[in-house]
């Protein structure tokens, strides 16, 4: 409704461009949620560790560190899965892995050999062997 009168006056093309440019700004939170839901499906389908009992995002006490997905295992609720989802079309997996490893230092504890999962909208480059990758095609099973 906000731009309706401008569209009716013939400015539809420029209004569409304006709205399209703002979509990326709004997609971060829904994308991260879709990423977490996909990881939960992978746990329940047996594609990831079956001992994961909780999976969600994590923030440290002062909210300076956020991890998009942390999977906790066993009675001790030890973090065994760490994930980062970026809405960018192409992301560097090695860079995302380094960022996740740095963020993991803020966790009270973490498994000795956690699963690292990184996600981008279309493609990941420079993928280390120690990281699992996902794209929108995986998340939405396209």
Task: Specify the residue positions occupied by each region the protein language model found.
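A cross-kingdom feature that marks ATP-driven nucleic-acid transaction machinery
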Residues: 1-142
């Amino acid at each position: 409704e906000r731009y309706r009168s401008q569209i009716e006056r013939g400015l539809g093309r420029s209004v569409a461009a304006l709205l399209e440019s703002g979509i990326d700004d709004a997609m971060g939170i829904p994308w991260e949620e879709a990423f977490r839901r996909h990881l939960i499906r992978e746990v329940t389908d047996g594609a990831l560790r079956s001992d994961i009992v909780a999976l969600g995002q994590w923030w440290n006490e002062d909210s300076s560190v956020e991890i998009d997905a942390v999977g906790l295992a066993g009675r001790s609720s030890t973090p065994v899965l760490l994930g980062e989802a970026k809405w960018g079309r192409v992301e560097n997996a090695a860079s995302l892995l380094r960022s996740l490893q740095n963020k993991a230092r803020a966790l009270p504890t973490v498994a000795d050999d956690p699963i690292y999962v990184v996600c981008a909208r279309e493609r990941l480059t420079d993928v280390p062997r120690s990281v699992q990758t996902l794209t929108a095609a995986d998340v939405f099973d396209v």
